[in-house]
Amino acid sequence: MPAIEIGRICVKTAGREAGRKCIIVDIIDDNFVLVTGPKSLTGVKRRKVNIKHLEPTDKSIKIPRGASDEEVLKAIGENGLTDYMVEHVKPKLTPI
């Protein structure tokens, strides 16, 4: 199970969105990924994030690369993870 893969649910550990869950939508390079909440569900806006600022969880959903927020919302609903995505988590603080 690769930790950083498309569809992996992660917790943001840095910034104003720390503690909120997001989903990896695209892998940009070795250090950066594109994530989305989507904003209407978790408050995490679609943006490029350093992988050092993400904490992968054991859950993932099946979405295509570069999926839109609507596709992500549909996949979350189909997998019954809506309540899981909305709850906030205190991220584990690890030195970078």
UniProtKB/Swiss-Prot annotation:
BP terms from Gene Ontology: ribosomal large subunit biogenesis; translation
InterPro entries, alphabetized: KOW, Rib_uL2_dom2, Ribosomal_eL14, Ribosomal_eL14_arc, Ribosomal_eL14_KOW, Translation_prot_SH3-like_sf
In terms of SUPFAM superfamilies, this protein maps to: Translation proteins SH3-like domain
Regions annotated as coiled coil? none
UniProt KW keywords: Ribonucleoprotein, Ribosomal protein
- GO molecular-function term, one example from the UniProt record: structural constituent of ribosome
Which domain of life does the protein's organism represent? Archaea
A GO-annotated cellular component: cytosolic large ribosomal subunit
Q: Where is the signal peptide?
A: none
Q: Which Pfam families match?
A: KOW
User: Is Protein transport one of the keywords?
Assistant: no
Q: Entry's PANTHER family?
A: 60S RIBOSOMAL PROTEIN L14, LARGE RIBOSOMAL SUBUNIT PROTEIN EL14
Instruction: Tell me which family the UniProt entry assigns to this protein.
Output: Belongs to the eukaryotic ribosomal protein eL14 family.
Q: What is this protein called?
A: Large ribosomal subunit protein eL14
